[in-house]
């Protein structure tokens, strides 16, 4: 996982870790929305 490698490099310079949250955001976004079809001509 590239986030683990990135966090290892950050730890070497004394910076805190980052967290991968785009998957949780996308899942929540999809669950909160309703599929609506547009009117056709």
UniProtKB/Swiss-Prot annotation:
A Gene Ontology biological process term: defense response
Question: Do you know which InterPro entries this protein is assigned to?
Answer: CAP_sf
Recorded hits in SUPFAM superfamilies, A to Z, give: PR-1-like (SSF55797)
Keywords noted in UniProt: Allergen, Pathogenesis-related protein, Plant defense
Its function, per the record, reads:
Probably involved in the defense reaction of plants against pathogens.
Q: Which family does it belong to?
A: Belongs to the CRISP family.
Per its record, how is this protein called by name?
Pathogenesis-related protein
- What organism does this protein naturally occur in? Cucumis melo (Muskmelon)
């Amino acid at each position: 996982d590239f986030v683990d490698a990135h966090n290892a490099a950050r730890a070497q310079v004394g910076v805190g870790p980052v967290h991968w949250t785009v998957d949780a955001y996308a899942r929540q976004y999809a669950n909160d929305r309703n599929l609506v079809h547009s009117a056709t001509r």
